[in-house]
Regions:
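Tandem repeat scaffolds
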Residues: 2-156
Length: 156
């Protein structure tokens, strides 16, 4: 499924069901609500979009997630996430508020390249804490602006 050049009020699990790949390209998206969607089996690709409200607490992107050249306006709370069989790629995007990764277990690689985190992220922060993120296949972090090793738990 490809949605291109659209204004989308809300995208949730019901919209993604039955698709192996779901692409959002050049869209204005008010809300992506995937809170508590364990084992999301779609490869979600978001490119050149503006997202007002990205809600992904407890979402497992089993078949991968790609966010490229996208602006995310809200604070993102990604707890108990990861569990990805395919890579999670975040590239060339701008996050206007804090992006909190909390107790995520990444089974495949996560890539952060050429992003701007205006208020930072704790992806590789919280060292030694019981809720520190884990990376079974490692991570690739390159050329990001903003602190990526914040040692904070909540949304700043």
């Amino acid at each position: 499924m490809v949605k291109e050049n659209q204004n989308i009020d809300i995208l949730n699990q019901d919209d993604l069901n039955g698709h192996s790949t779901y692409q959002l390209i050049d869209c204005f998206i008010n809300t992506i609500d995937l809170v508590g969607v364990f084992e999301l089996n779609v490869n979600l690709i978001i490119e050149n979009c503006i997202i007002n409200n990205l809600q992904i607490h407890s979402c497992w992107f089993v078949n991968g997630l790609s966010v490229k050249n996208t602006i995310v306006k809200n604070s993102v709370d990604y707890q108990m996430g990861g569990h990805n069989i395919k890579p999670i790629i975040i590239e060339g995007s701008i996050f206007k508020s804090f992006f909190s990764f909390f107790d995520c277990q990444f089974e495949n690689v996560i890539e952060l390249k050429n992003n701007i985190f205006e208020k930072g992220t704790n992806l590789i922060g919280n060292k030694g804490e019981g809720f520190e993120n884990s990376f079974a296949a490692g991570f690739l972090i390159d050329n990001n602006i903003g602190k990526i090793d914040v040692s904070e738990v909540g949304i700043l």
